[in-house]
Swiss-Prot record:
SMART domains: AMP_N. The keyword Metal-binding applies. Mn(2+) 2 binds at residues 275, 286, 478. It comes from Arthroderma benhamiae (strain ATCC MYA-4681 / CBS 112371) (Trichophyton mentagrophytes). Belongs to the peptidase M24B family. Its EC number is 3.4.11.9. This is Probable Xaa-Pro aminopeptidase ARB_01886. Binds 2 manganese ions per subunit. It catalyses: Release of any N-terminal amino acid, including proline, that is linked to proline, even from a dipeptide or tripeptide.
Length: 507
C-alpha cells in the first residue's frame, strides 16, 4: 500500500499527521467479506437444541432526553456479530433447522429520506450482507407468528427477556433467554481470521495516530491537543472513531486510571499516559503508551528525571516478560501474578517498598502491597467491545488454590481473564497486556494514614522515597496480543521504548 503525508496547521505550527515510518493506508480499501452467517451457525452449534429461532434486535434510533437530536449510534454488538450490519433500526432472525438468516430493515420513510438520505433498503442489503432473505420491519411480526405456529414446541432464543420481538399478545410464544448469551460469548471470545484482521487494522490506525502524536509532541501545550490529534488521524484514516474515551493524562493525571477530562496544560509535568485506540468495523483496539513531555527534558537527556526513567523501565520489563508467557493453555491469572512479582522485586530495589524487621517478603505478598501501585488487572479480552466478553468461568485450578491457601499469591481478582476461575488461554483469543505503576496521591495518603494498622499496606512502604516518584504520575504500556497454538502474535505496532524516544526527539 502506498504511504502518504498530510500536513495541517495547529496554532500556527505545521503538523505532519503522518510522519516518516507511519504505515501506509489504502483509503479506498473496503471490508468486502461478511462472516455473519458463519457466526450464526457457530452460535447455533452451542445452543442446547439444534432447532429453534434466534432473534436479535439491532440498535434503534433513540433521541437524547428533552431533545430532537438522536444519540450517537453504536450498533449492538451481538446483533452485529451475526449480521455485519452497521445501520440502525434493523432486526434479524435465524432459523436453525432451515439455516436461514433473515434481515429486517426499516420500512421506507419518504420524509426521513429527504432529511437524512435513504435508509438501508432490501436490494442494497441483499447485495451487501450474507443473508438469505431481506424484508422490511413490518413483516417481522407476521413472520415470527407463522414460525411459532408451525413450531409450537421449539424455542425462540432471545438475548434478554426485554428483547422480545413485537408479537400479538394473544399468542403464546416459547421464549428462551438463558442460553443465547452463553453461546454467543463462547463464540465471540475465539476470533476467526476475519475478526483478527479487523482488530489488526484497528491497531494499524491506532499505531499511526500514536506515531503522529509522538512526532509532534513538542508542539503541544495541552492534553486536549494530544487527544484531538488522535481522533483527527483516526477519522482521516476512515476509522469511525475511537473504541473508547481517550485518556490523555499528564503528570498526576496519569495516576488516575480512567482520566478523561483531557484539558490540562502540559507545562511543569514530566510524563503523559495516552490510552487511546481506534475502532475498525466495530472491532476495537486498546493501546496505551507513556512518554516524556519534551519541554520537561533538558541537557540532551531522554527523560525528565531518573525516577521517570526507572519506572518506565520496570513497566517495560513487566510487559515484555508477561507477553512472552502468553500462549495456549496458560492461566492468565498466573501471568498477572508474575507482573506483581516483578513489581515487588523492582520496587524493593528502589527502596519504595521495604521489609520491616520481623517480616518476610511473603508478608508483602499476603498484604498485596504492590496493588497500591498496580491496582488493576494485567489485561482483558478484546473484540467487538474494548472490554470484550469472556467465556464462562470454571473451577479454580488446584495449583492456584494451593498457592492462595499458603499466602503465596495475591487473591485480588479483576476483569476476566484476570480471575482465578477463568479458563486457560485458547488459540484465537485476543487479550490486552497492560501492566502499569502509578503514584496516586489519594491512594498514597490513605496508605500512609493506615500504616500503623496491623494488616495495612502502608507498613511496607517508604513514604519518603515514594515522594520522589509522585511527580512521575503513572506509567502504563498496553498491547493487544493474539493467543496462538505455539505462542502469541502482538497486533499492536505503536512505538514504545527506544523507537518512541527517537520519534519524540526527531532522531
Amino acid at each position: 500500500m502506498a504511504s502518504y503525508s498530510v500536513t495541517v496547521s495547529v496554532a500556527g505550527t505545521s503538523i505532519n499527521k503522518y510522519p516518516a515510518g507511519s504505515a501506509g493506508f489504502d483509503l479506498a480499501m473496503a471490508d468486502s467479506y461478511d462472516p455473519g452467517k458463519q457466526h450464526a451457525r457457530r452460535v447455533a452449534a452451542y445452543l442446547p437444541k439444534q432447532q429453534g429461532l434466534i432473534y436479535l434486535p439491532g440498535q434503534q434510533t433513540v433521541l437524547s432526553e428533552d431533545s430532537d437530536q438522536a444519540r450517537p449510534f453504536k450498533q449492538r454488538r451481538y446483533f452485529f456479530y451475526v449480521t455485519g450490519v452497521v445501520e440502525p433500526d434493523c432486526h434479524v432472525t435465524y432459523d436453525i433447522a432451515e439455516d436461514k438468516l433473515t434481515l429486517y430493515v426499516p420500512d421506507f420513510d419518504f420524509k426521513r429520506t429527504i432529511w437524512t438520505g435513504p435508509t438501508l433498503g432490501k436490494d442494497e442489503a441483499s447485495q451487501r450482507y450474507d443473508v438469505d432473505r431481506v424484508e422490511y420491519f413490518s413483516a417481522l411480526e407476521g413472520d415470527v407468528l407463522r414460525w411459532s405456529q408451525a413450531n409450537p414446541s421449539l424455542p425462540i432464543y432471545i438475548l434478554h427477556p426485554d428483547q422480545r420481538p413485537v408479537t400479538p399478545l394473544t399468542v403464546a410464544y416459547l421464549y428462551e433467554s438463558k442460553s443465547l448469551k452463553h453461546a454467543m460469548d463462547a463464540c465471540r471470545v475465539i476470533k476467526d481470521e476475519h475478526e483478527i484482521q479487523l482488530i489488526q487494522r484497528a491497531n494499524r490506525v491506532s499505531g499511526a495516530a500514536h506515531r503522529s502524536i509522538l512526532a509532534n509532541l513538542h508542539h503541544f501545550k495541552n492534553e486536549a491537543q494530544i487527544a484531538g490529534l488522535f481522533i483527527d488521524v483516526c477519522l482521516s484514516l476512515r476509522s469511525k472513531g475511537t473504541a473508547y474515551q481517550t485518556i490523555a493524562g499528564s503528570g498526576s493525571n496519569g495516576a488516575t486510571l480512567h482520566y478523561t477530562r483531557n484539558n490540562e496544560p502540559l507545562a511543569g509535568r514530566q510524563m503523559v499516559v495516552l490510552d487511546a485506540g481506534a475502532e475498525w468495523s466495530c472491532y476495537a483496539s486498546d493501546v496505551t503508551r507513556s512518554f516524556p513531555i519534551p519541554s520537561s527534558v533538558s541537557g540532551g537527556r531522554d527523560w525528565p528525571s531518573r525516577e521517570a526513567e526507572q519506572i518506565y523501565a520496570i513497566v517495560q520489563r513487566m510487559q515484555e516478560e508477561c507477553i512472552s508467557r502468553v500462549k495456549e493453555g496458560t492461566l492468565f491469572f498466573s501471568i498477572h501474578q508474575h507482573a506483581h512479582a516483578i513489581a515487588l522485586e523492582e520496587l524493593l530495589k528502589l527502596g519504595i517498598l521495604r521489609i520491616p524487621q520481623g517480616s518476610t517478603k511473603a508478608d508483602l505478598i499476603k498484604a498485596e502491597v504492590t496493588a497500591l501501585f498496580f491496582p488493576h488487572g494485567l489485561g482483558h479480552h478484546l473484540g467487538l467491545e474494548v472490554h470484550d466478553v469472556s467465556p464462562d468461568s470454571g473451577t479454580i485450578p488446584v495449583e492456584l488454590a494451593i498457592e492462595r491457601e499458603k499466602g503465596l499469591m495475591s487473591v485480588t481478582e479483576h476483569r476476566p481473564p484476570c480471575t482465578l476461575s477463568a479458563p486457560p488461554l485458547a488459540s484465537g483469543m485476543v487479550i490486552t497486556v497492560e501492566p502499569g505503576l502509578y503514584f496516586n496521591r489519594l491512594a498514597i495518603d490513605q496508605a500512609r494514614a493506615e500504616r500503623d494498622e496491623p494488616n495495612s499496606k502502608g507498613r511496607f512502604v517508604n513514604f519518603d522515597v515514594v515522594e520522589r516518584y509522585v511527580d512521575v504520575g503513572g506509567v502504563r504500556i498496553e498491547d493487544d496480543v493474539l493467543v496462538t497454538k505455539d505462542g502469541n502474535k502482538n497486533l499492536t505496532d505503536a512505538p514504545k521504548g527506544k523507537e518512541m524516544l527517537d520519534l519524540i526527539y526527531g532522531r
